[in-house]
Amino acid sequence: MLKLRLKRTGRKRSPSYRLVVMENTARRDGRPIEELGYYSPITKQYKFDVEKIKKWLDFGVKPTETVSSLLRKAEIIS
């Protein structure tokens, strides 16, 4: 089952994340099917490709709880 997930990048104690489409059984830092944006919790910056996210959501891909809250803050989903 495919999911919209966060993939951790960055250094130790300085996390940043990429929003990706991955198989739900894949490792957290495994190879994604597609990258859709990034999120930096320290600087509170994010950038998402809205068209690609909506395309994947239309295909039936489920976001995780954290990704859902980020997409609501970005007003991509309601």
Curated annotation (Swiss-Prot):
Keyword vocabulary terms for this entry: Chloroplast, Plastid, Ribonucleoprotein, Ribosomal protein
Q: Quick one: signal sequence residues?
A: none
Q: Which Gene Ontology CC terms are recorded? A: chloroplast; mitochondrion; small ribosomal subunit
Family, per entry? Belongs to the bacterial ribosomal protein bS16 family.
- Gene that this sequence comes from: rps16
Q: Please give the name of this protein.
A: Small ribosomal subunit protein bS16c
Q: What GO annotations for molecular function exist for this entry?
A: structural constituent of ribosome
Q: Name one GO biological process term.
A: mitochondrial translation
**SUPFAM superfamilies linked to this entry:** Ribosomal protein S16
Q: Which InterPro entries match?
A: Ribosomal_bS16, Ribosomal_bS16_CS, Ribosomal_bS16_dom_sf
Localization: Plastid, Chloroplast
What's one Pfam family the UniProt record gives for this protein? Ribosomal_S16
Keyword Ribonucleoprotein listed? The answer is yes
